[in-house]
Amino acid sequence: MFKDYAKIHVKAGDGGNGCVAFRREKYVPYGGPSGGDGGRGGHVILRADGGLRTLVDFRYRTHYKAGRGTHGQGKNMHGRKGEDLVLRVPVGTEVRRAGDATLMADLTVDGQEYRVARGGRGGRGNARFAAANRRAPSFAEKGEPGEELWLELELKLLADVGLVGFPNAGKSTIISKVSAARPKIADYPFTTLEPHLGVVRVGEGESFVLADIPGLIEGAHRGAGLGHRFLRHVERTRVLIHVVDVSGREGRDPVADFEAINRELAAYDPRLAARPQLVAANKTDLPGARDNARRLAEAAGGRYEVFEISALTGEGLDRLIYRTYRLLETIPVEPAPAPIVPDERETDVTLFLVAREGNTYVVEGEGIERRVAMTDLDNPEAVQHLQELLVRIGVEDALRAEGIRPGDNVRIGRFEFEYSENPTG
């Protein structure tokens, strides 16, 4: 089964908790804190695999989770990093955050990887909080939650040439004759409901990849007849072979069909209208077809080269394929997109904004939200340490400037507190 779209939920591993421990050794009367840090959570990574042709593996499972980092231990022993989760996708997969059109990654090279969800940092053990005025801290940080999000995966086939045209125009017969691809072929419309790829060998060491795109209908650019699903696979091609049934069967007009498909291509993406296109006037072995082929050539008006072929008998295919290859030689291959590197910068805890929402004051800032999420709010000493940080970086002053009063609510990330005057403020 071919599947070119998937929506999945990924969750990176949470960081392990830091440890609260103290040295207890003979002849060491004041051992001091020795709690180690928790391990980082595992990342979720997408890896392009040239052996895959579809996103069908994501059809029955939508939730994926990486491993959690282990907790720190005494004697300054740090926790192990959580196991990364690597999900294999076909080459040509585009990755977006669900509901956001912004491209996160375009995996066009075999083996290319992109981290879609970062594992949470391990919490610091109490040994990291020792200071001149805090010789025996009895608190540690919790592990940071791993990133989680919904992703949309969209596969756009990587082919040099795309076969386009109305259903039953003969595209599948062509690809079966010129390559080893074996799509389903029958004498009725919409026999092909999924794209097929085939390698066309022209000579020694000379070949190109041909894609058989399922038949388009009028309104395809608006999604009619699964048009959006099919048209996306044309986007990466460098040359189009427009297959037109010139037999005139069932009362169809080859010239009208030819013009209708070109309108759909232009309406979907104007760049497709400017893409080099060869026209294959197919089924010339049938009565009256050659007259229609000549009418089609006149309608093309020198804009396109028209080749009279019969995919069934093979007549004219060699000439069409040879011309396609020579045309490809004149069109440069687009360079692979530069890899998108996830932002690894440390978030500055001093960068925050304070806003009022009714009776609640909201403090926003990735750095401070992370610190709160990693604080053990059940430990009074850890809470005091957090309060000292909020005073030191100016959060309390900013809240006062907004008019906060004792008893008002403060929200930082997922956590909400009741404000009280800091006795040291």
Swiss-Prot record:
Needed co-factor(s): Mg(2+)
GO CC field: cytoplasm
InterPro entries attached to this UniProt entry: G_OBG, GTP-bd, GTP-bd_Obg/CgtA, GTP-bd_prot_GTP1/OBG_C_sf, GTP1-OBG_CS, GTP1_OBG_dom, GTP1_OBG_dom_sf, OBG_GTPase
Domain OCT: residue ranges: 341-421
Molecular-function annotations in GO: GTP binding; GTPase activity; magnesium ion binding
Predominant location: cytoplasm
Enzyme class: hydrolase
GO annotation (BP), single: ribosome biogenesis
Record keywords, A-Z: Cytoplasm, GTP-binding, Hydrolase, Magnesium, Metal-binding, Nucleotide-binding
UniProt family annotation: Belongs to the TRAFAC class OBG-HflX-like GTPase superfamily. OBG GTPase family.
Protein name listed in UniProt: GTPase Obg
Source organism of this protein record: Desulforudis audaxviator (strain MP104C)
Organism placement in taxonomy: Bacteria, Bacillati, Bacillota, Clostridia, Thermoanaerobacterales
